[in-house]
Amino acid sequence: MKRKYPPLEIVAPAIFALVFMVMLIYSKFEPNVEDVDAAYVREHSGMPGYVVVDARPEESYLGKSPRPGVPGGHIPGAVNFPHENLAGRTDIVAGLLAKAGITKDKTVIIYCNAGVLSERLADQLVRRFNFQPSRVKNYRGSTVEWVQDPRNVLLPPDHETGFAEDTASQRFMGK
């Protein structure tokens, strides 16, 4: 016996409505992470209660693999916490975040090359590690924008951060 299905003209709008409602509900739970600009980063970098985080791979942070249009190095005072470090178990990654000084009591300003990896890291801090969205900032312009202003510099390894020889990625990978 052959089953009779409703016509596509009836099913398609119902599926569309269902998908739309799921997207609408999901958007209500999106973390509301604020995008900031270079002036905000300059103003708050190094201030008590703030931490600037470079979400790029360690080689970019250290200036060993510059990209076209972006010289190597990092924003002064930034710590390195590569986005790929999020791949581990939540308890281990939480320990790495704390060791890097990325804690819930600070406002975290995250950057990368163009704001994509930093947005992902910001999203994970809010969703997975329960950081308050108001305390997580994404520098969307990141290093591409940063180097356009002659007042801004990218530094080579900075021993003040404690990450030049002992980066979060080295600890995570057991190096």
Q: Locations of the language-model features?
A:
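Active-site flanking residues adjacent to catalytic metal/cofactor-binding acidic residues
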Residues: 53
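Short, surface-exposed ligand- or partner-binding patches at beta-edge/loop junctions that are enriched
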Residues: 111-112
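Rhodanese-like catalytic fold shared by cysteine-dependent sulfurtransferases
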Residues: 2-50, 58-107, 116-175
